[in-house]
């Protein structure tokens, strides 16, 4: 897509290249999960293999971002690199092995029982508030964003996912509000297309945008 514009304008669409990160993860992680499934003898063993593989890849890729942050003045090379920016996905993989969906672990069942509704909602709301504060004080051109910001945001996001998962288990007879289902179905599509469309139309409409 960027090659359809002059070279001097290619940076305008650089934002869309970050989406390739998800494609890389979905393809490579699926292959690794398939490889481990062929060698696991039980569901529990498979879950453990996935957890340790996810943990190892998480630490390796995060440390790659951490170290490279000291070695470059252009943080875009870190942010748009799949190798250094992929670690939050592996954190999510670790969390998925703990919570499960169709096959829930006994430890997660105990965790659901030990959390009150108040605690669940507090963690969910507190994590969201923490992410909002991070967005105000850690810009993308700050060294601290790459040393600690992305890690802190990943931990907060995992806390939100965990609390939402527990909330789901605690409210089996409750239906999600229709507005939340609508946002869940459309938000990613809007994110995927808003930036290239904005750039393309702004070239033709100028200030009318």
Positions of PLM-derived features:
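Individual transmembrane alpha-helix segments
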Residues: 9-21
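Membrane-embedded glycan transfer/ligation machinery
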Residues: 3, 14, 25-29, 88-89, ...
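Alpha-helical transmembrane segments in multi-pass integral membrane proteins
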Residues: 8-9, 35-44, 66-209
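A membrane-interface helix-boundary motif in multi-pass transporters
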Residues: 46-50
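Single conserved hydrophobic/aromatic residue that forms the stacking wall/gate
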Residues: 1-7
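Alpha-helical transmembrane segments
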Residues: 53-61, 124-129
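Conserved beta-strand->loop/alpha-helix structural units within folded catalytic cores of enzymes
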Residues: 19-34, 91
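Transmembrane alpha-helical core residues of multi-pass small-molecule transporters
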Residues: 25, 32-33, 57-60, 149
């Amino acid at each position: 897509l960027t090659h359809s514009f002059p070279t001097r304008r290619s940076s305008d669409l650089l934002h869309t290249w970050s989406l390739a990160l998800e494609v890389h993860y979905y393809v490579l992680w699926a292959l690794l999960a398939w490889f481990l499934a062929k060698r696991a003898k039980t569901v529990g063993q498979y879950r453990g293999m996935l957890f340790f593989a996810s943990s190892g890849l998480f630490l390796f890729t995060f440390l790659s971002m951490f170290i490279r942050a000291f070695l470059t003045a252009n943080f875009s090379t870190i942010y748009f690199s799949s190798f250094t920016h992929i670690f939050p996905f592996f954190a999510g993989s670790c969390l998925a092995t703990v919570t499960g969906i169709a096959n829930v672990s006994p430890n997660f069942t105990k965790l659901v029982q030990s959390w009150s509704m108040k605690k669940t909602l507090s963690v969910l709301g507190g994590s969201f508030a923490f992410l909002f504060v991070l967005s105000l004080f850690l810009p993308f051109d700050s060294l601290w964003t790459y040393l600690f910001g992305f890690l802190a945001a990943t931990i907060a996001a995992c806390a939100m996912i965990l609390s939402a998962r527990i909330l789901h288990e605690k409210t089996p007879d409750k239906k999600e509000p229709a507005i939340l289902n609508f946002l869940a179905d459309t938000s990613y599509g809007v994110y995927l297309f808003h930036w290239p469309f904005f750039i393309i139309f702004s070239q033709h409409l100028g200030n009318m945008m």
